[in-house]
Amino acid sequence: MLKEFKEQRLKEIQELRSMGIEPYPYKFEKELTAREIREKYDYLQAGEVLESEKLSFAGRVMSIRHHGKTAFFHMKDDTGRIQAYIKADSVGKEKMDLFKRHVKIGDFVGVRGFPFKSKTGELTIYVQEYTLLSKALRPLPEKWHGIKDKEIIYRQRYLELIVNDEAIERFKKRFKAVRVIREFLNSRGFIEVETPILHYVTGGAEARPFVTHLNVFDIDMYLRIAPELYLKRLIVGGFEKIYEIGKNFRNEGISYKHSPEFTSIEIYQAYADYNDMMDLTEELIVEVVKRTCGTLKISYQGKEIDFTPPWKRVRMRDFLKEKLGVDILEDPDEVLLKKLEEHGVELEIKNRAHLIDKLRDLVEEELVNPTFIIDHPVVISPLAKRHREDPRLTERFELIIFGREIANAFSELNDPVDQYQRFLEQAKMREEGDEEAHMMDLDFVRALEYGMPPTGGLGIGLDRLFMFITDSPTIRDVIPFPIVKPKKFEEEEAEFEGGFEE
């Protein structure tokens, strides 16, 4: 069916060109969006015509109803849909015949005319001129819910955007949230910066990196797992309030909350500590939720999340004692391992850091409203400053919402000797088979030796945050083009079914 459909459309294109009509012209002067037309002329009464008001509009044809010498058709742009009406008496018999033969669902068309409301009260453009702007060679899906395979949606996101208006709004909300974040930080004197994506040494998080090869130097390099260490180098160099929004890459699993390629923001402020960063995190996310959702109490997958400040703050040690009855500072590894086994958790790597991480995962699931888990042990926080009251702990927090880690922040470690020792401990863990442990970064230690002021640092996983504000069940729903298992083009073509009937 698809092959025959394309062949027919190609014949139509040849016919248009033989008539001197270019089916892919260069430009069209679009004056108003669908939303602007509705806002400007919605006051019209049913049957009222405003012939003195000329306007132009362009968009994709989504439906057509032919009635003899007239036709109604719906057009769509990125603000919504608008109806148009065309008749032979207005555009001429030749242009009307051309419209009937060659303007199809999926095509882009530009129209000029005036607004009126139909007898049923629908705001409509009365078409006096039209221009074919782009011919579609493929049929649109017959109905959106007819695409059963979500993998097709993720591979061909443009299809979802074409036929599902909610998808457009979902991604608009995501992009608006990014704008809100920038406005919030810029208004507070932060500078947006850029740091490398190709790294000589990975760092800033515990994760397995993607490896690539730089031919000119004949060396392996890594896609960044986090920008943290380069951002702190900028603090060493003299910047005081900086942030970076960008992509990170971790060569790990895919799940409803994990993507190998994801977007984060990292924020660093000299002369601040983790208490300041907690306040900043709360204020920033409250602003994002308020401006994108209009309320601080939102529905997510049938449950309410209340972002109203102040948010709860809980010490990790106390939390795990209360929920699991273990003391992550005093109990030996055997006790922690036994507790995990009681909960059916299996571990490949059984060092203390992994034991504590898995225990934490067990109890965080129950936290729905935003909650700061604070004061993590040193063994799981190689880049955080030791706690001022207990050197076994660090001044670190994680923000948990709906059982998911959304943010991670520290009073940054700025003691080069302590940092070097932590790297040595991480290197030992790597030698024992922990591929996610930090690599030794001697240049970063060297940078710290020049002196870094007291600094608060914060990282937020933006995709997970955007899942909440768009009520999306999986992270792939908020990433425009997520990573999916590839299929051969021919296999994808075979999966395509149907099209609008014309």
Swiss-Prot record:
Family designation: Belongs to the class-II aminoacyl-tRNA synthetase family.
Entry keyword set: Aminoacyl-tRNA synthetase, ATP-binding, Cytoplasm, Ligase, Magnesium, Metal-binding, Nucleotide-binding, Protein biosynthesis
EC number: 6.1.1.6
Annotated residues for binding of Mg(2+) 1: 398, 405
Subunit structure: Homodimer.
Taxonomic path: Bacteria, Thermotogati, Thermotogota, Thermotogae, Thermotogales
Gene behind the chain: lysS
Name of the protein this chain belongs to: Lysine--tRNA ligase
NCBIfam families: lysS_bact, PRK00484.1
GO cellular component assignments: cytoplasm; cytosol
Classification via Pfam families: tRNA-synt_2, tRNA_anti-codon
Cofactor (UniProt): Mg(2+)
Cofactor binding summary note: Binds 3 Mg(2+) ions per subunit.
Subcellular location: Cytoplasm
Catalytic activity of the protein: tRNA(Lys) + L-lysine + ATP = L-lysyl-tRNA(Lys) + AMP + diphosphate
GO biological process, one term: lysyl-tRNA aminoacylation
